Amino acid sequence: IVCNNNFHGRTTTVISFSTDPGSKDYFGPHTPGFIHIPHGDTIALEDKLKKDKNVVAFLVEPIQGEAGVNVPDPDYLKKVRHLCSQYNVLMIADEIQTGLGRTGSLLASCGNCDCNSSCEQQSSYVRPDILILAKALSGGTYPISAVLCDSDIMEVIQPGQHGSTFGGNPFAASIAK
């Protein structure tokens, strides 16, 4: 499940679930099977989770940036976390545009950081199952990204099963350090 007006990049599968005609219409073929809901709408999320038992994950930007600055209600991510846990669906927070201090907090999703279970942005601590970071990770000086999650998720992919053109780049890692 993804949100309308999302922006998660420009790779083939990601473009497949874009709702921006300028990004999608002349680029394909598209990967099928994505479900769209309005950003900030937990009622729509729960409705889709109830109807489709094959949903694996919900990918969300804590604050949408490409669609304007679309800030959801303060308890939105807390409700998302609860629904994802209730329906055994991974919560994936895409913090590429919002993470690492770009919103005034370490993370806009307020998870996987030392905020003592509270945050100035939200009324409660929210920890996504998967956290995606980039851009600010190197201070904008060199391309680097990171996918953070617990080992029970990460170890589903075994060495050699998946590759990355720029993965494992020691120079980029030293810049991010």
Across the structure, where does each feature detected by a protein language model lie?
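Conserved N-terminal phosphate-binding loop of PLP-dependent enzymes in the Aspartate aminotransferase
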Residues: 1-177
